């Protein structure tokens, strides 16, 4: 495995650790995905989340109906309008998730060393002795000694609302288990996770397809989080489905790696997907604890070299109920950044946590501090070596823009792009300064009406480390004259000045297309 020692080599003064950080318009280069739910769906709360640094809003359809999520989305739109901050939308599918069904919703108490039976007969009432499940093939997949985890959805792992079971025997379609710890299951649905077994259910279920068709398509979702991705074929099938739903042909698919099957096929999945979500909660059940860090470092390195965004989950579980993360969690967030994560995904912490805004703010601050000690020089050299020669034309321009920006100590890189690809390639080389991605819309027609592309591309950069999008005036085409491009550049520079990232006498690196040529130029601002 490649060495991932990406800390700065020169030691820092210990006293400097105590110095307060300088305020910045961009809280961190690393992006934050927030899951919206009961504790974070009010307009004021969402507005505060956006100001604190959330750039992607995740809608988890493992719970809540389409009507509930639509209300939340409408609130998000109002918050975006009031804060003037862009935010992308991610739809998270349920996938082949096993669930315990508790129709009565009465609390179920389970005592350690007792026994409980898992049955596919959903007509039965859930009790301390019997738990109905939504899958009839569990008995065929399990053997005595197998471990099963049952818990509240978006559990934190430290709660008494989750239980570990060990299979003692299989009786027909039923599975008899020994309870390993005392717990109380409250609610109507609980996630059931079995370690290292194949579940013969489709990755994109009929229910998922219906949600995407009825909710995702009208709302033009930016990202589809494909839960329990196990093979590249899962991504291909999802993409084929999206391609038939109009604008969703532009939706990016993020493969969620949640089990050993996905881990074993990681390389082929990465090749097919637009990005990867490392679902450490479920995967952490499948893997021995001492192997989790190894998977994280390897997976993030592969994503970085492929130039595809990687998202890490389950970082500050304790902030679901507490105002401050544990020391281990704070270190974990920083290490995720140093390992190469593009974004941090918050689940229970913002969905039902008591402090959604504070959580986003604290995670953003930790990310920003970690970014200061990231060894960009070592990372750049490693990435160039990995890509090899000859580079593609676009990759050569992107890497040159980053190297030039670092050499002249530019305050920002401005990249004109229509597809977003050039800006993402620049971000791949992890520049130490923000990349302002100026998305130039393209005009298209279906013979009945005109429309512009660009909004998807702008929002989809909100999950990429260091990329900050703005939409250019649609009257300026992508391959415009030098004079027109200069006017778009002036708008971009004014935006940078207004946001505080560009000041007088700063140097700025500009990456643009003039005619058929790609140009990297360095400009110095006067007063």
UniProtKB/Swiss-Prot annotation:
Cofactor(s) the protein needs: Mg(2+); K(+)
Binding-site list for ATP: 60-63
Compartment(s): Cytoplasm, Cytosol
Protein's GO biological process: glycolytic process
Protein residues bound to substrate: 58, 256, 281-282, 313
Alphabetical UniProt keywords: ATP-binding, Cytoplasm, Glycolysis, Kinase, Magnesium, Metal-binding, Nucleotide-binding, Potassium, Pyruvate, Transferase
SUPFAM superfamilies per UniProt: Phosphoenolpyruvate/pyruvate domain, PK beta-barrel domain-like, PK C-terminal domain-like
Function: Key regulatory enzyme of the glycolytic pathway that catalyzes the final step of glycolysis, converting ADP and phosphoenolpyruvate (PEP) to ATP and pyruvate by essentially irreversible transphosphorylation. Is critical for plant growth and development.
Name listed for the protein in its UniProt record: Pyruvate kinase 1, cytosolic
């Amino acid at each position: 495995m490649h060495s991932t020692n990406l800390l700065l080599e020169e030691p820092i003064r210990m006293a400097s650790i105590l110095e307060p950080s300088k305020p910045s318009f961009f809280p961190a280069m690393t992006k934050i995905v927030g899951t919206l739910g009961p504790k974070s769906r009010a307009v004021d709360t969402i507005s505060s989340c956006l100001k604190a640094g959330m750039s992607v809003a995740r809608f988890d359809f493992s719970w809540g109906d389409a009507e509930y999520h639509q209300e939340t989305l409408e609130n998000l739109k109002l918050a975006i309008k009031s804060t003037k901050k862009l935010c992308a939308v991610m739809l998270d599918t349920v996938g082949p998730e096993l669930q315990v069904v508790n129709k009565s919703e009465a609390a179920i108490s389970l005592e350690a060393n007792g026994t409980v039976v898992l049955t596919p007969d959903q007509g039965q009432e859930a009790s301390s002795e019997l738990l109905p499940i939504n899958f009839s093939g569990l008995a065929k997949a399990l053997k005595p000694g197998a471990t099963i985890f049952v818990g509240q959805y978006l559990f934190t792992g430290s709660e008494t609302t989750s239980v570990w079971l060990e299979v003692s025997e299989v009786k027909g379609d039923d599975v008899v288990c020994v309870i390993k710890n005392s717990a109380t299951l409250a609610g109507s649905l609980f996630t059931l996770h079995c370690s290292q077994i194949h579940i013969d259910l489709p990755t994109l279920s009929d229910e998922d397809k219906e949600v995407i068709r009825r909710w995702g398509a009208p709302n033009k979702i930016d990202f589809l989080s494909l839960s329990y991705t196990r093979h590249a074929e899962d991504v291909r099938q999802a993409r084929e489905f999206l391609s038939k739903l109009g604008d969703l042909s532009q939706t990016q698919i993020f493969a969620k790696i949640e089990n050993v099957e996905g881990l074993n096929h990681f390389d082929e999945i990465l090749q097919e997907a637009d990005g990867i979500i490392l679902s450490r909660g479920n995967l952490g059940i499948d893997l021995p604890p001492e192997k989790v860090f190894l998977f994280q470092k390897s997976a993030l390195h592969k994503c970085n070299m492929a130039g595809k965004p990687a998202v890490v989950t389950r970082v500050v579980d304790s902030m679901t109920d507490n105002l401050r993360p544990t020391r281990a969690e704070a270190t974990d967030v920083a290490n995720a950044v140093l390992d190469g994560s593009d974004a941090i995904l918050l689940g229970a912490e913002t969905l039902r946590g008591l402090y959604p805004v504070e959580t986003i703010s604290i995670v953003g601050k930790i990310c920003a501090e970690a970014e200061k000690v990231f060894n960009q020089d070592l990372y750049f050299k490693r990435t160039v070596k990995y890509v090899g020669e000859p580079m593609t034309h676009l990759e050569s321009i992107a890497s040159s823009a980053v190297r030039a920006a670092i050499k002249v100590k530019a305050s920002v890189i401005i990249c004109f792009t229509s597809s977003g690809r050039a800006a993402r390639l620049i971000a791949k080389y992890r520049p130490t300064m923000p990349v302002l991605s100026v998305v130039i819309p393209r005009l298209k027609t279906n013979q009945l009406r005109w429309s512009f592309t660009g909004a998807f591309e702008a929002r989809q950069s909100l999950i990429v480390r260091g990329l900050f999008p703005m939409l250019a005036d649609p009257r300026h085409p992508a391959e415009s004259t030098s004079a027109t491009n200069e006017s778009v550049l002036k708008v971009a520079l004014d935006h940078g000045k207004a946001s505080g990232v560009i000041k007088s006498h700063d140097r700025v690196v500009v990456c643009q297309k003039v005619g058929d040529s790609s140009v990297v130029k360095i400009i110095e601002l006067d007063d």
